Structures are given as structure tokens and as C-alpha cells.
A protein has these predicted regions:
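C-terminal alpha-helical interaction module
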Residues: 2-364
Length: 364
């Protein structure tokens, strides 16, 4: 099993076991924190090293959807459904891609309750778990899943593989025809939305994986994942002081590098927004409201970085993106779910963030 510090520089088709086109992503260790029944509330003990470092498990389902008949899953309107949490940075990237490509009429979407107890992600009305609410009898609810009437996302995993025993994660791309999970890896789902579903997209000209910068883009995307996306979790879930300090230093060294890169460039690759920008965005949007305090990533805030902060505002203000972000879900999930980090489950009122003020990056 690959640990959190490992990734493979190869292209791989999870169905055929053959090398993929370079347009399709590398296999990487990417997972959002979600649970199967009986697994501790944040992550499995198997994901903690002997020296207190957090190490992610591997993705479970890696089938591929194609538009050329090369796989068992053809791209089609209305066949696939996306299950996500708006709290999860990994799942949120798929929601962003669905919005940017204009795939709302092609791919359905269901959002789980941001609060996750020992039974895992639930298809429950989020009003039941607002801060300060009683968390008793949470298993008494009507499902909000319009497709299968699942009560818990774990049911989708069990329907796909009855022997599945690992953590249940978001995002999940569900096939309504075969009644199984096609893929639960956002690093696969995003390029599938970009390429395989392009004929059904209302924004066909939006290409978030431009071929001409593929090598450099993939290298930077890996850097952001390894040091920033996963870096906040390495700091937040460290169980030894030394492991925490190493993770925190590595994270802020990477943020400093991104701040420098954005000094003379509006986006990571000039004036064009690509996948790596949205990968970084999904961590930045959560940083000051949860990672800075909850995960002790507190050397600096994003608002303390002039370029990164302006860049965050710029991306947030792109058409449709604000609809994909829920600060409420983000704060409720982290502060109420990670009981071992926040035993009182009190959700802080702040910080106050203004994501609509001028970003000042138009001249770059």
C-alpha cells in the first residue's frame, strides 16, 4: 500500500490494467476523510505511522468512463450521479469541474450531511446537525438520496463490493445503470469530466488540462497535492510533536513558494486557469476558517499572503464558483466530526472572511 508520501509517475487504466493516455491522470494516494462503520472518527489506525505521521490509504474504485467505447462505461447524459460533501476539499474539486464544464444537466449531484458520526457520511437533512443541535437519535431520518434512497454512503460501497472494509470516502461517481460505484477518486473524475463528457458540456471550450503544458502542469499539481493539499492533514492528524513540526514547516515552505510564483503571474500558468489552480483553491478556501486553527497550521494565514489571498479571491469570484462553496458545511464538518481534536464540538463563529472584495489581480 502506498503511503501519503508516495505517488507513481505513470498513467494507468484501473479497469484494463494497461497504461493510459497521458491525458489521464497518474495514480496517486488521494482520499477524503470519511468512515465506514466501526472505524475511528477521523481516520483508520492503519493510517498512522509509528512516528505519528498521517499516511493515506489507497483509492478503492478506479474504473474509467470513456467517449470512444474503450471501456465498459460510456459517457452518457443522465447515467451517472455524483455523491459529494461540500466540506471535503477532494470532493469539492469535482463539484467545481462539473460547474466549470457546465455538466449540471448531464451528471446529477447529491450532497451529504457535513456532520459525520461513527456511521459515516449520511444522506440526512443538514438542518438536523446544526451547531448546538442535539446529536441524539441521528439514525432516525429520511434519506435525501434521490437515486437509491441510501441512508449512508457506505451502502453504495457495500453494493459495489460486499467485502469492502476500508474507510468510505467522497467523492463517489455512481452508475445508475449497473448500480455500482464507477470511481471514487477525484483525480480520475475531474479529467473524465473534462474529456469524456465534453460533448455533453455547455462549456466545451473550457479545457482544464491543456496539452501544451502537460508535463509542467502535472509536476506542479503533484507538488501542490503532496505539500499543501495533503500537507494540512499531515499537520492536523500528526500524533507526535516532531511529526507535526515537520509537516507544518513543509506546508508553509510550499505556501511561500506559491506566494512567490504568483508575484508576477495572475494564475499558476499565466492568464489561463487550469486544474492545478482549482487543486490549490480547494485548500486555500478552507485554510483560514479551519486549517489555521483546527489543524494548527498557524504560522500564517492566507490573508497574510498578499498574492495568495488575492488569488483566492480571484478564483472564488469566477462565475459559478461561489455556488460550489459552503463555509458553513466546511466549519461544521471539521469542528464537529473530529472529536479527538475538538472534544466539545463547538463550532467557532469566526473568522469573518470577505470573499467578495476586489482582488486586484487584473493587471497581472
Amino acid at each position: 500500500m502506498l503511503g501519503a508520501s508516495s505517488f507513481l509517475y505513470l498513467f494507468w487504466d484501473g479497469k484494463s490494467g494497461k497504461a493510459r493516455s497521458p491525458q489521464q491522470p497518474r495514480v496517486r494516494v488521494l482520499f477524503c476523510h470519511a468512515l465506514n462503520t466501526g472505524v475511528p472518527s477521523s481516520h483508520s489506525p492503519r493510517e498512522q505511522s509509528a512516528v505519528g505521521e498521517f499516511q493515506r490509504q489507497e483509492d478503492a474504485f478506479r474504473e474509467w468512463i470513456s467517449n470512444d467505447g474503450s471501456t465498459s462505461y460510456p459517457a452518457a447524459v443522465g447515467r451517472y450521479h455524483l455523491y459529494v460533501s461540500l466540506a471535503c476539499p477532494w470532493a469539492s474539486r469535482t463539484v467545481v469541474f462539473r460547474k466549470l464544464k457546465g455538466l449540471e444537466n448531464a451528471i446529477g449531484l447529491t450532497i451529504v450531511d457535513p456532520f459525520r458520526d461513527e456511521k459515516g457520511w449520511a444522506f440526512r437533512d443538514p438542518e438536523r446537525t446544526k451547531p448546538g443541535s442535539s446529536l441524539k437519535d441521528l439514525d432516525k431520518f429520511e434519506s435525501t438520496d434521490p437515486i437509491n434512497r441510501f441512508r449512508y454512503l457506505s451502502e453504495a460501497y457495500q453494493a459495489t463490493d460486499p467485502n469492502f472494509k476500508e474507510r468510505v470516502t467522497v467523492p463517489v461517481l455512481w452508475d445508475k445503470e449497473t448500480k455500482r460505484i464507477v470511481n471514487n477518486c477525484e483525480d480520475d473524475i475531474c479529467p473524465m469530466f473534462n474529456f469524456a463528457f465534453n460533448e455533453f458540456a455547455s462549456n466545451k471550450d473550457v479545457d482544464l488540462f491543456p496539452k501544451e503544458i502537460e508535463v509542467e502542469h502535472n509536476k506542479l499539481s503533484d507538488f501542490i497535492y503532496e505539500n499543501i493539499n495533503n500537507g494540512v492533514y499531515r499537520a492536523g492528524f500528526a500524533t507526535r510533536q516532531q511529526a507535526y513540526e515537520r509537516a507544518c514547516k513543509r506546508l508553509f515552505d510550499a505556501l511561500d513558494e506559491m506566494e512567490k510564483r504568483l508575484t508576477e503571474s495572475r494564475y499558476l500558468f499565466g492568464k489561463r486557469i487550469v486544474e492545478a489552480d482549482w487543486r490549490l483553491f480547494c485548500t486555500l478556501i478552507r485554510f483560514d476558517v479551519v486549517y489555521h486553527g483546527h489543524f494548527k497550521c498557524n504560522l500564517r494565514r492566507i490573508i497574510d499572503y498578499p498574492n495568495l489571498h488575492g488569488y483566492l479571491l480571484d478564483l472564488y469570484q469566477q462565475p459559478g464558483i461561489a455556488e460550489t462553496v459552503s463555509i458553513d458545511h466546511i466549519k461544521r464538518h471539521y469542528y464537529m466530526t473530529h472529536e479527538e481534536i475538538n472534544p466539545t464540538r463547538i463550532v467557532p463563529l469566526g473568522p469573518i472572511v470577505d470573499l467578495t472584495k476586489p482582488h486586484g489581480r487584473e493587471t497581472l
